[in-house]
Design a protein with these regions (language model features):
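Membrane-interfacial amphipathic/re-entrant helices at transmembrane-helix boundaries
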Residues: 1-77
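Small-residue-rich segments of transmembrane alpha-helices in multi-pass membrane proteins
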Residues: 29-33, 103-113, 157-169, 235-248, ...
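Membrane-interface helix termini and inter-helical loops of multi-pass transporters
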Residues: 44-64, 120, 175-194, 301
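Transmembrane helix-bundle core of multi-pass membrane transporters
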Residues: 57, 155-159, 163-212
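Structural signature of hydrophobic alpha-helical transmembrane segments
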Residues: 66-80, 122-134, 201-205, 252-265, ...
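Hydrophobic alpha-helical transmembrane segments
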Residues: 72-76, 126-131, 153-157, 197-202, ...
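Short loop segments and helix-boundary regions at transmembrane helix junctions
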Residues: 87-176, 273-286, 302-309, 328-329
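Helix-loop-helix "hairpin" substructures at the membrane interface of multi-pass membrane proteins
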Residues: 198-269
Length: 330
């Protein structure tokens, strides 16, 4: 290969990378503003009336129902923050941490169901799930640091142990159960109520703002933690930031994807984008594009064929990943 050929390929790659970033920003920023307005309850009623009329003109009235907009809004934010946080998780070789946090959050849901049912309070399970998710993530770090268990052993212990605790708590709760636990295991569009939408909107905006503010430091710590420590960065603090953001994203996404599948949105879009990306930044933008495509296509399939949205979303994401593998190996 001549120097001219190499330069031409490099320029072509930079052009493709710039195109992905421009497309993501061109469609992503207006969509983020729109879904933020919906999540905050600021979207004018005329928007929903017009959407209903357009849908009716095409023979469907699904756009007339609130649950559809709730699911789309939560899904849009899942497709955004899952890959954003997941990019740092995957490149730090922590792919299984999302699965562990999800199972720890399940224990929190079980605990919250037991406690709230016993005392008769009508409160959200989000706080219980978030606390146990963070405890599970910290538990993995502590086991890795203070025991001889290496590799994925601490992850496997916390993953299995937290899920087992959840099962035991559900059995102990018996008649105190106040929610359909299957909706948390597999996801359910019908439980994405207005409160869930508001929580996910706030969570997503907070995560995006935090990652944006600490982007350079997180990037440094991700690729060279030793050099980052020498440079004076508090690596442990940024590790905790990534773990905390992962916990928040996992718990916020459980309502639509379910505990079993929620970790997929942290890993699969990033893995797909990584097959064709040549830089961290392009992988980040590409993973968001894959995540949003998987969410909207998956929801469309779920509503068309009456299947669970979490499974449909992940199936689409895996399909995109396999296509990216085929393209990347050419």
């Amino acid at each position: 290969m001549t120097a001219g050929d190499a330069e031409g390929r490099s320029n072509a790659f930079r052009g493709r990378r710039g195109l992905v970033e421009r497309v993501t920003l061109l469609f992503g920023v207006p969509a983020l503003v729109a879904f933020t307005a919906i999540g905050a309850g600021l979207m004018p009623s005329q928007f929903f009336e017009a959407s209903c009329a357009v849908g009716a003109a095409f023979g469907t009235r699904i756009a007339c129902f609130d649950f559809m907009w709730n699911a789309l809004t939560v899904g849009a934010f899942v497709g955004l923050v899952g890959p954003v946080v997941g990019t740092f998780v995957v490149y730090r070789e922590m792919a299984l941490i999302g699965e562990t946090i999800a199972h720890a959050a399940f224990a929190g849901v079980a605990l919250g169901t037991l406690v709230l049912g016993a005392v008769g309070w009508n409160a959200t399970l989000f706080a219980f799930a978030l606390v146990t998710a963070v405890v599970g993530a910290v538990g993995v770090q502590r086991l890795a640091e203070h025991t001889d268990a290496g590799g994925d052993v601490p992850v496997a212990i916390v993953l299995a142990g937290s899920f087992a605790v959840g099962v035991v708590l559900l059995d102990l709760g018996g008649g105190f159960a106040t929610v359909e636990i299957g909706s948390y295991l597999f996801g359910d569009v019908s439980i994405t109520d207005d409160r869930s939408v508001r929580v996910m909107t706030l969570v997503s905006l907070g995560v995006v703002a935090t990652v944006t503010a600490a982007y350079k430091q997180l990037l440094f710590v991700t690729f060279d933690p030793r050099a980052a420590r020498v440079a004076g960065l508090d690596v442990s603090r940024y590790d905790a930031l990534v773990v905390g953001a992962t916990a928040v994203v996992v718990v916020g996404s459980m309502r639509i994807l379910g505990v079993i599948l929620v970790a997929a949105m942290l890993v699969v879009p990033v893995a797909a984008a990584g097959q064709v990306a040549r830089s961290f930044r392009s992988a980040l933008y590409g993973s968001v594009l894959v995540g949003e495509t998987a969410v909207f296509a998956g929801l469309a399939l779920a509503w068309s064929y009456g299947v669970r949205p979490g499974g449909a979303i992940v199936v689409v994401a895996v399909g995109i990943y396999l296509a990216a593998v085929a393209v990347g190996n050419r």
